[in-house]
């Protein structure tokens, strides 16, 4: 799994020109799932994201987690994170998991985050054409790959 994590002041997802979900201050996570991902990836990545200390404390240091600032989480599936551009100019998405594998892992990831943060997680709709809007705070953008554990 690959996650692009963005610290935001606010973020929202529109589907068919209607707002589907929105958050105030917190994290926007773009989540890509590959065909080799499994439940261990879900557990490790959700725990890592939910405990990341990337929010400022009183001294201005990144020292607080999402729960410590009472922030919200918006998770959006994004298979294009596994694009390969090795050949030609059109990306290949062969490394992205097929929906029948990816959807259960996506749902497990959301459930794991809800359990760890003790809050309802806002989401996009898997496979939908979505418009994502955000105000990046910092900007702080972090890429985490569950296979590399970094």
Swiss-Prot record:
- Which EC main class describes this enzyme? hydrolase
Q: What is its EC number?
A: 3.1.1.96
For this record, the Gene Ontology CC terms, alphabetical, are: cytoplasm
Q: A Pfam family name for this chain?
A: Tyr_Deacylase
Q: Out of the domains of life, which is the source?
A: Bacteria
Q: Read off the CDD domains from this record.
A: Dtyr_deacylase (cd00563)
Major localisation: cytoplasm
Q: Which reaction does it catalyse?
A: glycyl-tRNA(Ala) + H2O = tRNA(Ala) + glycine + H(+); a D-aminoacyl-tRNA + H2O = a tRNA + a D-alpha-amino acid + H(+)
Cellular localisation:
Cytoplasm
**Paired cysteines (S-S):** none
Spell out the InterPro entries in the cross-references: Daa-tRNA_deacyls_DTD, DTD-like_sf
Q: Some GO term, biological process aspect, for this entry: which one?
A: D-amino acid catabolic process
* Motif residue range(s): Gly-cisPro motif, important for rejection of L-amino acids: 138-139
Q: Relate the assembly described in the record.
A: Homodimer.
Tell me the function of this protein.
Answer: An aminoacyl-tRNA editing enzyme that deacylates mischarged D-aminoacyl-tRNAs. Also deacylates mischarged glycyl-tRNA(Ala), protecting cells against glycine mischarging by AlaRS. Acts via tRNA-based rather than protein-based catalysis; rejects L-amino acids rather than detecting D-amino acids in the active site. By recycling D-aminoacyl-tRNA to D-amino acids and free tRNA molecules, this enzyme counteracts the toxicity associated with the formation of D-aminoacyl-tRNA entities in vivo and helps enforce protein L-homochirality.
Q: What is known of its domains?
A: A Gly-cisPro motif from one monomer fits into the active site of the other monomer to allow specific chiral rejection of L-amino acids.
For this chain, the family text in UniProt reads: Belongs to the DTD family.
Q: What is this protein called?
A: D-aminoacyl-tRNA deacylase
Q: Which organism is it from?
A: Cytophaga hutchinsonii (strain ATCC 33406 / DSM 1761 / CIP 103989 / NBRC 15051 / NCIMB 9469 / D465)
What gene does the UniProt entry assign to this protein? dtd
């Amino acid at each position: 799994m690959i996650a692009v994590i963005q610290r935001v002041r606010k973020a929202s997802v529109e589907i068919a020109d209607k707002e589907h979900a929105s958050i105030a201050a917190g994290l926007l996570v773009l989540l890509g799932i590959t065909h080799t991902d499994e439940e261990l990836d879900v557990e490790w990545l959700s725990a890592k994201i939910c405990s990341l200390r990337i929010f400022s404390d009183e001294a201005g240091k990144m020292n607080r987690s999402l729960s410590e600032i009472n922030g919200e989480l918006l998770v959006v599936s994004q298979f294009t994170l596994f694009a390969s551009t090795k050949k030609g100019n059109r990306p290949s998405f062969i490394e992205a998991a097929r929906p029948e594998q990816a959807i259960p892992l996506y749902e497990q990831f959301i459930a794991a985050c809800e359990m760890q943060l003790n809050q309802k997680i806002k989401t996009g709709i898997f496979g939908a054409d979505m418009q994502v809007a955000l105000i990046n705070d910092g900007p702080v953008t972090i890429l985490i790959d569950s296979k590399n554990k970094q």
